């Protein structure tokens, strides 16, 4: 099961916030029961990765650790209990790691240890290291098989561009949780941020009509342009957030009663009125996915119109599998004329983290290639 693994590998190790990253030579991990070792082809870089590791973002995690989060790579070796996963297989390595005996204990690989004692123990003692490395040992269930012939052959996607799926999965988790259907109308708010804009793209690809809310008309126009570049048939309306909840609700109602809302409000905007406006514009029986820091959502329409509110943190494994099916059917534009992927070597990690903070949004992806 471990044939062909080198004795050593290179990894980007964070000793602590003050010392920063260093490239180190580590002993290559061996798979045991319930795990796989993956040869990393590309590791994704998040827009906020730099702030996480600089200590500017209050994410808690143990150190030292290998940085990263998700990745695309080939299985190098598997534990003896693996029945489907095989060496050589292309996989997406997902960052959401859950305790097998307690699904409520979960953390985000190499960026956040979670909030429970169980999740903190699991990260500290078992799955501490991320994917900024030549190899990574990960749970079997976090290796999502990808059809390499279909994706990289028939559809012509590059391995680097496939990393874009890690960004899309977050808003897709909320969209799938409220069971958005083809032809429905969904309000995305706010829509011009990182995950909000990706939520607009996903909903449009799924055949929904999207109403995008944002404070900047210029950014909203650019959002529509970017999404329609990859999906020319996408139906996207825009509504400017004015701060007057009733005025904004009326502006939304111009397009008819909406079926659903995807809310990914950043903490800094948690008291904004846009979520109230969106809820007021829903039809009776409408659904809301709350994926952000919303503290100000109380409106009578929730009760009067039988509105369903569902909180969602990240996504489930089943959601990833369903997303991959859509990806393998060619529903998501990942062509060279749409994708703008920047690739950095492990040695050039600092420039990669800097690029990740600036180069993000629709069709944009930044990766490390160990």
Predicted regions and their residues:
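Glycine-rich beta-strand-centered segment in the early N-terminal region that forms part
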Residues: 27-44, 56-107
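Residue-level marker of beta-strand positions
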Residues: 89-90, 135, 185, 205, ...
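Glycine-rich cofactor phosphate-binding loops and adjacent beta1-alpha1 units
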Residues: 180, 201-204, 211, 224-308
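Residues in the short beta-alpha loop(s) of Rossmann-like NAD(P)-binding domains
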Residues: 216, 294, 315
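C-terminal hydrophobic helical "lid"/dimerization subdomain
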Residues: 2-7, 173, 246, 272-276, ...
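NAD(P)H dinucleotide-binding glycine-rich loop of Rossmann-like/cofactor-binding domains
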Residues: 98-187
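Mid-domain Rossmann-like dinucleotide-binding core that forms the NAD(H)/NADP(H) cofactor-binding site
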Residues: 153-243
């Amino acid at each position: 099961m471990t044939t062909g693994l080198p004795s050593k590998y290179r990894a980007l190790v964070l000793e602590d916030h003050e010392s920063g990253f260093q490239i180190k030579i580590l002993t290559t991990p061996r798979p045991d029961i319930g795990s796989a070792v993956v040869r990393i082809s590309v590791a994704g870089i998040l827009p906020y990765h730099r702030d996480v590791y600089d200590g500017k973002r209050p994410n808690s995690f143990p150190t030292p650790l290998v940085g990263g989060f998700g990745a695309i790579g080939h299985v190098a070796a598997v534990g003896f209990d693996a029945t489907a996963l095989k060496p050589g297989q292309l996989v997406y390595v997902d960052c959401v790691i859950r305790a097998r005996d307690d699904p409520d204990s979960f953390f985000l690989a190499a960026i956040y240890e979670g909030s429970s004692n169980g999740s903190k123990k699991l990260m500290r003692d078992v799955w501490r290291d991320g994917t900024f490395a030549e190899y990574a040992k990960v749970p079997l269930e976090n290796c999502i098989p990808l059809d390499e012939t279909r994706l990289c052959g028939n559809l012509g996607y590059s391995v680097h561009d496939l990393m874009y799926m890690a960004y899309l999965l977050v808003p897709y988790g909320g969209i799938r949780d409220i069971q958005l259907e083809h032809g429905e109308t969904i309000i995305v708010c706010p829509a011009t941020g990182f995950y909000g804009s990706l939520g607009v793209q996903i909903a449009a690809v799924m055949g929904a009509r999207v109403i995008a809310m944002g404070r900047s008309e210029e950014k909203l126009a650019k959002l529509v342009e970017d999404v329609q570049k990859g999906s020319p048939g996408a139906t996207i309306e825009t509504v400017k957030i004015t701060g007057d909840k009733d005025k904004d609700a009326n502006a939304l109602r111009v397009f008819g009663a909406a079926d659903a809302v995807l809310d990914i409000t950043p903490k800094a905007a948690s008291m904004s009125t846009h979520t109230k406006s969106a809820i007021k514009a829903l039809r009776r029986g409408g659904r809301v996915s709350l994926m952000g820091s919303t503290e100000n959502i109380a409106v009578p329409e929730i009760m009067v119109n039988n509105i369903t509110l569902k909180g969602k943190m990240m996504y489930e494994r089943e959601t990833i599998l369903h997303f991959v099916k859509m990806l393998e059917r060619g529903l998501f534009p990942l062509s060279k004329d749409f994708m703008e992927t920047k690739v950095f070597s492990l040695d050039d990690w600092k420039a990669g983290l800097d690029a990740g903070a600036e180069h993000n949004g629709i069709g944009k992806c930044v990766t490390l290639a160990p």
